[in-house]
């Protein structure tokens, strides 16, 4: 066996990665979790359960829906359709093919169903199996997720955003005194199921409890209690305690003394011990709970109260006559003075009454007596009448309806989460499998509600993240699936009942179209399925990590109040407090924090390090908001000694409710993992975030997502250390799939021979086809560039190619430029930006934008449209860029109005002239009448054609251009196949050589003789095929050769088969939309240089528009002659309070000056003035310990490293744990600069120094997607609105500029009457006047007449619609 790791001299690429000087102090014990795993886990792991054997699938996602819907039986129970298993076929097209052909990337879902037919004996009713049929049924195509967590739907990349919604369960709250004028708090409870009817319970102003179902009319809560089967006695016994009053002759009543029921008050009568007769307190004296406890402790068990005390109390059981057992008063009735007389007359010794006092109000008892329903039947009928008004109420229907509402698992589902929340809130212990309401639930909800009213317990905070959960992709699609399958179930039952079941197969019963349409509708039109923001890799990642409170089942913008949008203490480490849109969606759309993840119940968890006995361990525990409330959590920057023990007397900790307290170190349970866990990915890319005002940080994180990928990428000198993670997880860069050695590299692809050998010992080959100048969703350019060279050894997950906006495996959204903060002739007024001509000349901020144009040749009523070069009435000059088929060449430079694809459409028949009749009579065939319908470049677009794609309908003959494109693609596929085969062959034959050399020949081709010993020279004389003809004496060697041959042939066949499949796909034609014969797509790339009007921004929310481009010689320059690139306004800082940008500028200034210093040292080393030790010493001083592994290498490698940082030293200053002001000063000193970071600047125009020192430094600036080229527009001739006949507005409608009300005032103020008249008539909507004016311009005359504007006629018509006839009458005078 040959080891492939032999002779690897190349260094692993990971040494190629950029080293940053890191200012962080906190050691990271947890890596940032994969940034898009929220999408992938939810869909692939939890919903589809792809790549999991059928037997090992858990009952969740698709499996659980199919299990819950099936089995389906018909009404007579003769046929029964059961679910066995499901699996996915391979998708017809891969991701790339789908996006090119405008198809959806989906896999066919095959479900195995079993249909059982039963025979039912009509006399006995027994059932016997008549037959069982099992069949695999196609249930439609299910969209698959790409490796980057997106979906391809009709050729466009889409993202399904996760939704935040209220967790199922029970919630208690009050109206904050807003409903009733007295400001009284009205408490209410609401049971929110995952699906099913909502149940509300509420108090009114009179303290009566009501309930309502699905916001319908309210009923007494006791009606609900009776409906679940409770009698009056059970209700009273469940909600109240009872106390017995015993008669003491001639003295009054003795009653048990309960100190808990005593509140502080003045006694109205003496407090007398019933057992001893002692007076403990006199009337008028004050009793307190403390005093009551003291008396109780001293043996006070019963007290004596006056006879009249019973008046106003409520009976806790029926009052009966001792002699006849006749009921005198019902349970719950109030004791009146008359009733007390009866009690005395009948000498009743014991009276049981309810304990009702300020701690336990009479609400349930009052509701009972207000409620007219006295039994279960009446209560059920009452509920039925509210929910089904107008239908006759009978007890059976009412019972069914009530059961179906809350107790039927088909219609009501609390979900596992809802059951857990319900159990914990109501202190119940019901199994998690019970996901419907139970009688205990309802009884206890009323109990907790009453306790809240009595002042026990607290209301729920609905914005607490323990009460809001996340529905990710998998769950959202699962809900759609359920809807589709429920609809399908109905159609299956109908089909079972309709036909002869004996002859039917499962596929005859299932109509997959119902399911497909529901899923398709969700992906195409749902508010949560969104067109992916693909401006740059950061915007992609952020979009996938977004949490929206909007969407179906969520909030709506108009109704969301301030509380929902606000930052909540539980957001800490879960939802970013910074990143959210400005405008009406603020706070409703959020971003997940960097380290957060979503647990199986849908709650967001944040990681913490466990603290045991003051000792901070490396154990990382993820806690949800609910669990977090139980612990004391310290901050990540708490002081820790070298043994990992917390230092200091007290530690600042977070406790329940988001409050901060100082606790002793041994009481701390956890500390944060890193300060960065608070913010989102975008915010964690802002260096010195801690020095910025929150509003500006918000703008900064939002604007990074709008940065356009530039031609030349450049990672920031001042970063945060997260740049690499973002580039890797976004999928923009290409990662190596296995360890291996680079065999071939060019700009289009990388071929790597892997080192992970197969079972047969042969290597596999990874071929990475790079994306070249592809269009993104936002018309920016996706282009990948290789980072490796032939012979490089790469490790798994190394970055081997950069994508858009990445530089050496780090995200690079903008460029490092030299800025000066200085007012310059008013050109940087109000955040304007002044730039040097160098920036434009050297393409520093130049970006490429790609637009796609499509033309479809259809089959029309009058005949097919044709793509051709032969277009009527078009000059040869206009056709110069088209090939013989009529499609533009790749590489052609085009501008607005040029023809991209020539197309003609048949014209309708016009009346035939006599001459034509004659011609037709002579020649028979009429000259075919066509009109030009070519695709032209729209206005405002110019550029170079970079790609053309031609799609032809199956069965339609392909044109030459389509064949040429197809040939090119086949050649590419063949090259991939041949290269892979070549690498495998090279390996196989070198292995064969090693086996054969030294063996004795038994038989072989003509050139060799039996008995010879094989040498390498002999083998060189043989062709590759002749190797297999050799037979040698050693049987073991022959066996091995036989095995190699088998494996080699298998590999070769597999490659050929794969090639053949792909070629067949290319040649077979395309599935085009209805009626389309041919589709041509043309891609035009435009270079956008920076120009006045373009918007730029830094990472700190400092945005501005370019006001002027100044020649280099006029720009301010440094004393060494370096010209400043950009001049910014210093007044943009103080009021905005984003000081982070100044610290960034200073550190950037240190960065380039340190780089200059390193370059000088290298120069001196090369001139032999200094040794390598001085360079090492300087690098050690600069980078610290983490550079040791480079300093231990050879001198050449150290110099090579120094050359890499010759442009600027890269820093990492992590969020909230980065460089302090002193660190920045230290770096400036090390670079030999003034610690103030300010320098003398010279004015380029006068050559004189500016009066004061100026802050100058390297700053990272971004070019945003708001380009002036796409905004500015003017109209000459264009469309008019149908009703008002005024020109349309806006660039997309090619509209005009509105001359509005205020503009009219301006003309009126100047008295420019004629100008005003023409503005309001012929230049706008006087139709006849417009035509006449056009005529007079054509004739060269200068006069015009204005008539009545069309909008005046519209107004008159509106008057008439109001029955007012307004006429314009011209009188003769």
Swiss-Prot record:
Its EC number is 2.7.7.6. GO terms for molecular function: DNA binding; DNA-directed RNA polymerase activity; ribonucleoside binding. GO terms for cellular component: DNA-directed RNA polymerase complex. The keyword Transcription applies. The keyword Oxidoreductase does not apply. InterPro entries: DNA-dir_RNA_pol_bsu_ext_1_sf (IPR042107), DNA-dir_RNA_pol_bsu_external_1 (IPR019462), DNA-dir_RNA_pol_su2 (IPR015712), DNA-dir_RNAP_su2_dom (IPR007120), DNA-dir_RNAP_su2_hyb_sf (IPR037033), RNA_pol_bsu_bac (IPR010243), RNA_pol_bsu_CS (IPR007121), RNA_pol_bsu_protrusion (IPR007644). It catalyses: RNA(n) + a ribonucleoside 5'-triphosphate = RNA(n+1) + diphosphate. Pfam families: RNA_pol_Rpb2_1, RNA_pol_Rpb2_2, RNA_pol_Rpb2_3, RNA_pol_Rpb2_45, RNA_pol_Rpb2_6, RNA_pol_Rpb2_7. DNA-dependent RNA polymerase catalyzes the transcription of DNA into RNA using the four ribonucleoside triphosphates as substrates. The RNAP catalytic core consists of 2 alpha, 1 beta, 1 beta' and 1 omega subunit. When a sigma factor is associated with the core the holoenzyme is formed, which can initiate transcription. This is DNA-directed RNA polymerase subunit beta.
């Amino acid at each position: 066996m040959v080891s492939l790791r032999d002779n690897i001299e190349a260094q692993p690429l990971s040494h190629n990665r950029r080293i940053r000087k890191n200012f962080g102090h906190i050691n990271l014990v947890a890596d940032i979790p994969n940034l898009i795993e929220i999408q992938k886990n939810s869909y692939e792991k939890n919903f589809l359960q792809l790549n999991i054997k059928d037997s090992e699938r858990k009952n969740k996602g698709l499996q659980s829906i199919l299990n819950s819907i099936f089995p389906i039986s018909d009404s007579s129970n003769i046929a029964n359709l059961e679910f066995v298993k499901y699996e996915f076929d391979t998708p017809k097209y891969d991701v790339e093919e789908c996006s090119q052909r405008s198809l959806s990337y989906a896999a066919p879902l095959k479900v195995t169903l079993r249909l059982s037919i039963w025979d039912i004996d009509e006399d006995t009713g027994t059932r016997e199996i008549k037959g069982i049929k099992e069949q695999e049924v196609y249930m439609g195509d299910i969209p698959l997720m790409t490796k980057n967590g997106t979906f391809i739907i009709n050729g466009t990349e889409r993202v399904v955003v996760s939704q935040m919604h209220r967790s199922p369960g029970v919630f208690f709250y009050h109206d904050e005194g807003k409903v009733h004028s007295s400001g009284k708090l009205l408490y209410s409870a609401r049971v929110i199921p995952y699906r099913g009817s909502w149940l509300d319970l509420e108090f009114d102003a009179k303290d009566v409890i009501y309930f309502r179902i699905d916001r319908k009319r309210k009923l007494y809560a006791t009606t609900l209690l009776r409906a679940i089967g409770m009698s009056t006695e059970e209700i009273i016994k469940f909600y109240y305690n009872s106390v017995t009053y015993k008669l003491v002759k001639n003295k009054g009543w003795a009653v048990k003394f309960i100190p808990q029921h005593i509140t502080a008050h003045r006694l109205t009568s003496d407090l007398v011990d019933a057992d001893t007769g002692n007076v403990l307190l006199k009337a008028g004296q004050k009793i307190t709970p403390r005093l009551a406890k003291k008396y109780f402790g001293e043996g006070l068990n019963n007290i004596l109260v006056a006879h009249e005390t019973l008046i106003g109390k409520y009976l806790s059981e029926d009052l009966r006559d001792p002699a006849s057992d006749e009921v005198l008063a019902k349970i719950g009735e109030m004791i009146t003075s008359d009733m007390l007389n009866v009690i005395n007359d009948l000498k009743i010794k014991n009276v049981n009454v309810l304990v009702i006092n300020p701690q336990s109000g009479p609400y349930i008892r009052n509701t009972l007596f207000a409620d007219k329903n006295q039994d279960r039947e009446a209560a059920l009928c009452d509920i039925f009448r509210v929910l089904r008004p107008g239908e006759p109420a009978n007890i059976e229907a009412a019972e069914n309806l009530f059961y179906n509402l809350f107790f039927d698992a088909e219609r009501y589902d609390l979900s596992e989460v809802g059951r857990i929340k319900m159990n914990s809130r109501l202190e119940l212990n019901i199994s998690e499998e019970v996901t419907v309401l139970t009688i205990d639930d309802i009884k206890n909800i009323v109990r907790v509600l009453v306790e809240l009213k009595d002042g026990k317990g607290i209301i729920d905070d609905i914005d607490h993240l323990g009460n809001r959960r996340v529905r990710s992709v998998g769950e959202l699609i699962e809900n759609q699936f359920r809807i589709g399958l429920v609809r399908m179930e109905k159609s299956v039952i109908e089909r079972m009942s309709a036909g002869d079941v004996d002859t039917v197969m499962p596929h005859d019963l299932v109509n997959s179209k119902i399911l497909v349409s529901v899923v398709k509708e969700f992906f195409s039109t749902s508010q949560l399925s969104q067109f992916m923001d693909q401006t740059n890799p950061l915007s992609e990642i952020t979009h996938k990590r977004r949490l929206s409170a909007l969407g179906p089942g969520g909030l709506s913008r108009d109704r969301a109040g301030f509380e929902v949008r606000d930052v909540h203490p539980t957001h800490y480490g879960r939802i970013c407090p910074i990143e959210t849109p400005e405008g009406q969606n603020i706070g409703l759309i959020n971003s997940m924090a960097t380290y957060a993840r979503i647990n199986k119940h849908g709650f967001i968890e944040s990681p913490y390090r466990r603290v045991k006995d003051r000792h901070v361990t490396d154990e990382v525990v993820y806690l949800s908001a609910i669990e977090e409330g139980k612990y004391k959590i310290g901050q990540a920057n708490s002081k820790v000694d070298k043994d990992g023990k917390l230092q200091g007397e007290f530690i600042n900790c977070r406790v329940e409710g988001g409050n901060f307290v100082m606790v002793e170190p041994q009481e701390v349970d956890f500390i944060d993992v890193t300060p960065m866990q608070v913010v989102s990915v975008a915010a964690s890319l802002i260096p010195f975030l801690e020095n910025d005002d929150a509003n500006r940080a918000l703008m900064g994180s939002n604007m990074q997502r709008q940065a356009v990928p530039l031609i030349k990428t450049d990672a920031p000198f001042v970063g945060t250390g997260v740049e690499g993670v973002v580039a890797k997880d976004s999928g923009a860069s290409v990662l190596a799939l296995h360890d291996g050695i680079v065999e071939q590299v060019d700009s289009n692809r990388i071929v790597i021979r892997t080192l992970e050998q197969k079972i047969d010992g042969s290597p596999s080959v990874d071929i990475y086809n790079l994306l070249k100048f592809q269009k993104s969703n936002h018309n920016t350019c996706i282009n990948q560039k290789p980072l490796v060279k032939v012979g490089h050894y790469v490790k798994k997950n190394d970055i081997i190619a950069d994508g858009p906006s990445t530089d050496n495996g780090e995200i690079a959204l903008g460029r490092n430029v030299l800025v000066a903060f200085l007012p310059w002739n008013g050109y940087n007024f109000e955040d304007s930006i002044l730039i040097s001509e160098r920036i434009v000349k050297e393409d520093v901020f130049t970006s490429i934008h790609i637009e796609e144009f499509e033309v479809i040749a259809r089959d029309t009523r009058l005949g097919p449209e044709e793509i051709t070069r032969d277009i009527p009435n078009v000059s040869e000059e206009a056709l110069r860029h088209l090939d013989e088929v009529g499609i533009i060449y790749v590489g052609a430079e085009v501008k607005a109005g040029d023809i991209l694809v020539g197309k003609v459409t048949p014209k309708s028949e016009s009346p035939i002239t006599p001459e034509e009749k004659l011609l037709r009579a002579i020649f028979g065939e009429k000259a075919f009448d066509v009109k030009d319908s070519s695709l032209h470049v729209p206005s405002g677009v110019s550029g170079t054609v970079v790609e053309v794609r031609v799609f032809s309908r199956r069965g339609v003959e392909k044109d030459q251009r389509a064949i040429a494109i197809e040939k090119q693609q086949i050649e590419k596929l063949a090259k991939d196949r041949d290269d892979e085969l070549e690498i495998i062959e090279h390996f196989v034959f070198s292995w064969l050589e090693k086996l054969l050399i030294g063996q004795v020949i038994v038989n072989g081709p003509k050139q060799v003789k039996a008995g010879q010993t094989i040498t390498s020279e002999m083998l060189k004389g043989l062709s590759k095929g002749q190797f297999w003809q050799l037979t040698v004496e050693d049987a073991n060697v022959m066996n091995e050769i036989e095995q190699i041959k088998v494996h080699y042939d298998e590999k070769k066949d597999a490659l050929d088969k794969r090639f053949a499949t792909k070629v067949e796909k290319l040649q077979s034609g395309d599935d085009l939309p209805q009626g389309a014969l041919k589709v041509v797509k043309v891609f035009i790339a435009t270079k956008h240089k920076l120009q006045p009007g373009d918007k730029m921004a830094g990472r700190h929310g400092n945005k501005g528009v370019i006001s002027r481009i100044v020649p280099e010689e006029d720009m301010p320059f440094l004393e060494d002659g370096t010209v400043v690139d950009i001049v910014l306004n210093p007044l943009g800082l103080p009021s905005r309070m984003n000081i982070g940008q100044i610290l960034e500028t200073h550190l950037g200034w240190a960065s380039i000056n340190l780089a200059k210093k390193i370059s000088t040292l290298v120069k001196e080393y090369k001139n032999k003035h200094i040794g390598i030790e001085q360079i090492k010493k300087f690098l050690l001083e600069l980078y610290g310990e983490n550079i040791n592994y480079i300093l231990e290498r050879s001198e050449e490698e150290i110099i090579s490293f120094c050359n890499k940082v010759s442009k600027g030293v890269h820093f990492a200053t992590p969020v909230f744990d980065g460089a302090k002001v002193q660190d920045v000063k230290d770096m400036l000193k090390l670079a030999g600069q003034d610690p103030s970071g300010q320098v003398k600047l010279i004015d380029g125009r006068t050559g004189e120094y500016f009066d004061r020192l100026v802050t100058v430094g390297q700053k990272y600036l971004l070019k945003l997607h708001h380009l002036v080229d796409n905004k500015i527009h003017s109209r000459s001739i264009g469309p008019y609105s149908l009703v008002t006949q005024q020109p349309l507005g806006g660039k997309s409608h090619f509209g005009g500029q509105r001359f509005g009300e205020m503009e009219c005032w301006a003309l009126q103020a100047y008295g420019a009457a004629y100008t005003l008249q023409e503005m309001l008539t012929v230049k706008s909507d006087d139709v006849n006047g417009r035509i006449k004016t056009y005529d007079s311009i054509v004739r060269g005359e200068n006069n015009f007449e204005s008539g009545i504007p069309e909008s005046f006629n519209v107004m008159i018509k509106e008057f008439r619609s109001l029955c007012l006839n307004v006429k314009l009458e011209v009188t003769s005078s």
